Amino acid sequence: MKLIIALAALIVVINAASDQELWADFKKTHARTYKSLREEKLRFNIFQDTLRQIAEHNVKYENGESTYYLAINKFSDITDEEFRDMLMKNEASRPNLEGLEVADLTVGAAPESIDWRSKGVVLPVRNQGECGSCWALSTAAAIESQSAIKSGSKVPLSPQQLVDCSTSYGNHGCNGGFAVNGFEYVKDNGLESDADYPYSGKEDKCKANDKSRSVVELTGYKKVTASETSLKEAVGTIGPISAVVFGKPMKSYGGGIFDDSSCLGDNLHHGVNVVGYGIENGQKYWIIKNTWGADWGESGYIRLIRDTDHSCGVEKMASYPILA
């Protein structure tokens, strides 16, 4: 009996040591510092809870009971509630899409699978940081891809200009916004390059006072009918599309095809880009370009289950720009 207790105690010590090692690596990787020992202890406890959640889920993945796995990332020391609140910064009122021109799509024209990354028209993944600017990054990325498709230009555009300058168009800088509002702003004002108006991750005074510095112009934008069939046709024939999803369940995503029955489309708050779709082992998926940096998910991307009632609402608010 004493031996069993001793072995159990040893396992606890080993697990704790492992957690401590992972914690040290996490803090180094993500340059974490905390204002007090009390705060660090709290964050370490949350980190341990995250580790347990990851381990429990990944057993299901290894046993073939799940199609995706979880991993430690920059969000591993915050609670699910804190992550939700971070995503829920979106103070912008949802735009009325009723009067917006609908994309004229031909059903059946899209290929069975496509990945616009392989065609060289998707620029690198960005990291929004602590600014609620996913909508601005999504707006810029959609325009970048259309520009690359139309003219071969691969100039990174300025989401910071959108953050700083499009408040009068219904956006709220680091507190949220929507791609269609961003497209409307660019249609009227153009958009500078990221080199000329670099991303800072915080809202500032608008510095875009000279439209001649713009490197791209829009004549308009269109919405995609709210169905996954229409979204497939749009992505397959037009290019990467801006979309909005329910992002909370994606916090610890590491890879695979994300299939979570809780990821419904009732609470859309995170701007992304749909850059392709495909099928793996009979399972359909979307290829989503996220805004949480290349160290999250599959090099900054998530493959999201397609043609289900829990595709995170990806089809509900899709739109794309039309270049001049």
UniProtKB/Swiss-Prot annotation:
Disulfide bridges in this chain: 131-174, 165-206, 263-312
Pfam family for this entry, one: Peptidase_C1
EC number of the protein: 3.4.22.-
Tissue note: Expressed in larval carcasses and gut, and adult gut.
GO molecular function: cysteine-type peptidase activity
Stored InterPro entries: Papain-like_cys_pep_sf, Pept_asp_AS, Pept_cys_AS, Pept_his_AS, Peptidase_C1A, Peptidase_C1A_C, Peptidase_C1A_papain-like, Prot_inhib_I29
Domain of life: Eukaryota
The keyword Glycoprotein appears for this protein: no
Keywords: Digestion, Disulfide bond, Hydrolase, Protease, Signal, Thiol protease, Zymogen
Family recorded in the similarity comment: Belongs to the peptidase C1 family.
Identification of the protein by name: Cathepsin L-like proteinase
